[in-house]
Amino acid sequence: MQNALSKLDQREHVIATINKRIDQYHQAKLPVIFIQHTEPEMEVASKNWQLFDRLHALGTDTFYNKTRPDSFYQTGLESFLKMNHLDSIEICGAQVEFCVDTTIRVAYHLGFTINLLIDGITTMDSNLLTAQQIKQHHAQIWKHRFTEFVTTTSPINC
């Protein structure tokens, strides 16, 4: 959910959904982790790299940079989760077919229980499919195989 992704489908709705869940985690005093992608168009500290201003990120949250779609690859995320005895994670963000999909599959292979904030994920239209088609396609693959879907009314399961 970085500035470089300004053309995300239903961006404002997704940000509002994510913020509601972030607020629930903050109220429960549970960790909130932000993963920021870095590449030539999204260099660290650049405007494109920065999180959307509207996200309810706090200085006390945990932040990692990544260079691959996999949020675990050379980030310290797996160590953080294990050191904090967290065996389940909740995922939200963008982009469905890149970072979200890869992170779900890697987390699954690492043995984590995964909950997906289904209204808190998005992507952009491709040359072949709309963002909604991409999301629906991936959701059909993930559901009950790799992850369970949650909403902002679901209890937090950590």
Question: What feature does the model see in each segment?
Answer:
Residues 1-6:
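Short acidic, Gly/Ser-rich segments with clustered Asp/Glu that frequently serve as metal-coordination loops
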Residues 7-34:
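A short alpha/beta connector and helix-capping loop motif
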Residues 16, 23, 28, 40-158:
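Active-site-adjacent betaalpha module
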Residues 37:
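Conserved H-loop
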